[in-house]
């Protein structure tokens, strides 16, 4: 019976240890002003993209930031120019949603059971860029994600403290982070413990 529950227990532990890396995707995030904004993850970690969100009516609807995000190759990342609509990963197009900011999640897993799912490899980098919806901006928002590495600290770019801005994921930026909710809730260790309990009881009999 050991060969049944031991692999499941290992899977439970690996899932419980997965980290979530949050990126606030908007032009006020000073991280996007760096030339090489990079997030380092491990396999089975999550990347949570928090879309632009406005709590009140102080910003006109036409001025609200909306983006189409693409997953692209390195050369397209450098040029900040996607080559195909097939590269669309998400749309951030609900900046005034009543429930709060949209959260879009990517799981960096080696294999996926879904036909349209993405698979990732250790030691590889993956690239995301965005294009504004309904308005034009000169700033290119782009992100590099490297699988299997440690998070490095990059100097924070200068930000005008008087500038009205959206949230940023840099902990040194004194802003209040709203909480978004994922459509795929994370499995907690307690749930796995309940699922594994019948197998452990069978072994003890």
Curated annotation (Swiss-Prot):
Glycans are attached at residue 26. GO terms for biological process: angiogenesis; aortic valve morphogenesis; cell migration; central nervous system neuron differentiation; endocardial cushion to mesenchymal transition involved in heart valve formation; ephrin receptor signaling pathway; mitral valve morphogenesis; negative regulation of dendritic spine morphogenesis. PROSITE patterns: EPHRIN_RBD_1 (PS01299), EPHRIN_RBD_2 (PS51551). CDD domains: Ephrin-A_Ectodomain. It holds the Pfam family Ephrin. Residues 1-17 form the signal peptide. It is a lipid-anchor; GPI-anchor. Expressed in myogenic progenitor cells. Disulfide bonds join 51-92, 80-140. This is Ephrin-A1. Residues 183-205 form a propeptide. It comes from the Eukaryota. Belongs to the ephrin family. One of its GO terms (cellular component) is side of membrane. Keywords: Angiogenesis, Cell membrane, Disulfide bond, Glycoprotein, GPI-anchor, Lipoprotein, Membrane, Secreted, Signal, Tumor suppressor. It is found in: Cell membrane. Residues 18-161 form the Ephrin RBD domain. Monomer. Homodimer. Forms heterodimers with EPHA2. Binds to the receptor tyrosine kinases EPHA2, EPHA3, EPHA4, EPHA5, EPHA6 and EPHA7. Also binds with low affinity to EPHA1. A lipid is attached at residue 182 (GPI-anchor amidated serine). Undergoes proteolysis by a metalloprotease to give rise to a soluble monomeric form.
């Amino acid at each position: 019976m050991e060969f049944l529950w031991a692999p499941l227990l290992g899977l439970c532990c690996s899932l419980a240890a997965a980290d979530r890396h949050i990126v606030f995707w908007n032009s006020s995030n000073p991280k996007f002003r760096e030339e090489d904004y990079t997030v380092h993850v491990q396999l089975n970690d999550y990347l949570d993209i928090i879309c632009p969100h406005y709590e009140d009516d102080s910003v006109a609807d036409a001025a609200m930031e909306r983006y189409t995000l693409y997953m692209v190759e390195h050369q397209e990342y450098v040029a900040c120019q996607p080559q195909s609509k097939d590269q669309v990963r998400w749309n951030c197009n609900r900046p005034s949603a009543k429930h709060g900011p949209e959260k879009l999640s990517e799981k960096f897993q080696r294999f996926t059971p879904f036909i349209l799912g993405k698979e990732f490899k250790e030691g590889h980098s993956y690239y995301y860029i965005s294009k504004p919806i309904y308005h034009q901006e000169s700033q290119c928002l782009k992100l590099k994600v490297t699988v299997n590495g440690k998070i490095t600290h990059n100097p924070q770019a200068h930000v005008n403290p008087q500038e009205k801005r959206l949230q940023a994921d840099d902990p040194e930026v004194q802003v209040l982070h709203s909480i978004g909710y994922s459509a795929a809730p994370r499995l907690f260790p307690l749930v796995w413990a309940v699922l594994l309990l019948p197998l452990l009881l069978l072994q003890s009999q």
